[in-house]
Amino acid sequence: MKLRNLKATLFMKNKISIPYGPKKFILKREEFTFTIYPHSPYMVNATGIKSFQELEEAQELLEGIFHQQVIKVRIDSTFYSQKNFDNVDLNQVYSFMKNSDTFYAEYNIELFAGMYLHPKKENYPTILFVRTGSYTMMGGRDENILNKCEMFVNRLIEKFGK
């Protein structure tokens, strides 16, 4: 599973004083995009981040640009994906997932060839799971929970693979 995109909010020690007027201020540096809204001048939204290492690089870059310390980093959303070439019986997975206390499964082959696994618990990602065993995880914020979800999906692939 590979992290494809991450959105984070970085909280600055002091108010950012940029003459941005009533509209948001967008700053593009390297592959990152930083957005500052006038109603929250202590917060900087960062996008275009592809790894946790890049998140640290974005933080250092921001500290260098504004000459002040980032006091807190909050991960708002992540997007992971994994491409597999297995063959998974989604009907069996759907039956199995009816008893899950973590995810609610939605599977309607006429609408979408894959399965949606919607979280029942806070901070868990939404998972799109297709019959090849490929999956994407969207919205998770906690790295430990994301690792648990990855292991969970891999167990589903092992258990229901044809």
Locations of regions flagged by a protein language model:
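Intrinsically disordered, low-complexity polar/charged tails and linkers
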Residues: 1-127, 132-136, 140-162
